[in-house]
Amino acid sequence: WYLNAPQDPNYVYAAQTSTSQRMQVAIDKATTGARGDLAASLETKIESMTKSFTEEIDGELRESYTQAQKEITSKVLRGTSPKEKKVFQEDNGTWRAYVLMELPVGKAAQEFLSKMNSNEGEMYTRFRSSQAFKEMKEAVDEYEKEQQSGMASQNDSNR
């Protein structure tokens, strides 16, 4: 999984490795690096999903839109979780950690739509009419369906 990250249209993945004389520091460094990679991937994904929309808006709205994107990236990354983690001690005593972080695409889209709706009435109205909105809405719907399915199967197993 480190060299070949999983491919799933509903998730963004990032893998990192790091070393340290202390095991927890190696894990923390690898996790932080993977989150940084997720941030870059998330920003790229949001930018590509909304490129056609940003070309339609003027400079003032573009600035507000960019700020919303940064806030969303920051907020969503706090909810990332490690999918895989491997730690071992190398021959020289140094600890090496491998971490694979995952982020549900729908969660990012959900946060983005929520921020857009609360942030700028005019911008949200214009955004709703764009193809980018339709794509994000589909990602949110898929994420919510997946969350409900997960809760249903968890409830079934608790009975």
Give residue spans per PLM region:
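Domain-level marker for long, solvent-exposed, non-transmembrane regions
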Residues: 1-159
